[in-house]
From Swiss-Prot:
Subcellular location: Cytoplasm
Species per Swiss-Prot/TrEMBL record: Geobacillus kaustophilus (strain HTA426)
Protein family: Belongs to the ZapA family. Type 2 subfamily.
InterPro entries noted in UniProt: Bac_CellDiv_Activator, Cell_div_ZapA-like, Cell_div_ZapA-like_sf, Cell_div_ZapA_firmicutes
Protein name: Cell division protein ZapA
UniProt keyword terms in alphabetical order: Cell cycle, Cell division, Coiled coil, Cytoplasm, Septation
Entry function: Activator of cell division through the inhibition of FtsZ GTPase activity, therefore promoting FtsZ assembly into bundles of protofilaments necessary for the formation of the division Z ring. It is recruited early at mid-cell but it is not essential for cell division.
Subunit text: Homodimer. Interacts with FtsZ.
One of the protein's GO biological processes: division septum assembly
Coiled coil: 58-91
Superkingdom field: Bacteria
HAMAP family attached to this UniProt entry: ZapA_type2
Location (main, coarse): cytoplasm
Length: 91
């Protein structure tokens, strides 16, 4: 990973400017930033009394929960596909 060129992208998340440095494309970094910004605004509307640090943690926890559910579903589908492929070989 040390040999990959790094991309620097300026983004705005919940009214704050950040410079994100990463190996992903600028478009991907902007997409991620927009997703986080949208989620923070979504949770802010539901919880208007939260300060920004608590809102950021709530957003991170919810995004992590979504990610883990998708990862679990991906693994389940992968196992199902493997079983189906193994079943075809037995025929």
């Amino acid at each position: 990973m040390t040999g990959q060129p790094k991309t620097r992208v300026s983004v705005r998340i919940y009214g704050q400017d950040y410079t994100i440095v990463g190996a992903e494309s600028p478009a991907h970094i902007r997409l991620v930033a927009a997703f986080v910004d949208d989620k923070m605004h979504e949770f802010s509307e539901k919880n208007p009394m939260l300060d920004v640090p608590k809102l950021a943690v709530l957003t991170a926890v919810n995004i992590a929960s979504e990610y883990l559910k998708l990862k679990e579903e991906y693994n389940r589908l992968r196992e199902q596909l493997k079983k189906e492929k193994d079943g075809e070989r037995d025929d």
